[in-house]
């Protein structure tokens, strides 16, 4: 009886961890008319409405006296603010530059499985948020093109997720152009900077192969 209770408790904790890990990461869609995916965002992020058809997980704005998300917070000869926004921490990239990065990096943990090496033609690689590994997992341990298998709940679960953007790259579905835009126009791999509709003044990193 004690074993069964322990097993039930472990399964309950696993289910809760899996539900929490399914919340959207930075630049993931989290709402909009017709959207049927997850509507929560990871710690340190908020679901920002971009229009009636599209909402996106964005970093929470910095409060008075705090460095905004992904802003500089340290480095040689730096004399500015060092306190990051809630959910972010000051991370040293090199001796000259430290940046406010997400405090909880679980969605971008070290990949455990190659995203481009399917185990065999009989197995179908997982789509985004599909399970791809973990204790007693018996399914395909690979993900579709452009996704990586990340360990999201320790040894219990791994999930197919999109890799984070590299320095200078714009994340999936993030703005990459348009009237008054001054940021980077280079999208992450597999995505292209395109107008969201004909004649639109707003450009976004969209899949090359929808």
From Swiss-Prot:
Signal peptide residue numbers: 1-22
Keyword Acetylation annotated: no
GO cellular component, one term: extracellular region
MF terms in GO: cellulose binding
Gene Ontology biological-process annotations: carbohydrate metabolic process
Electron transport in keyword set: no
Domain CBM1 intervals: 23-62, 63-105, 125-165, 166-210
Keywords: Repeat, Signal
Domain of life (superkingdom): Eukaryota
UniProt name for this protein: Putative polysaccharide-binding protein
Source organism per UniProt: Porphyra purpurea (Red seaweed)
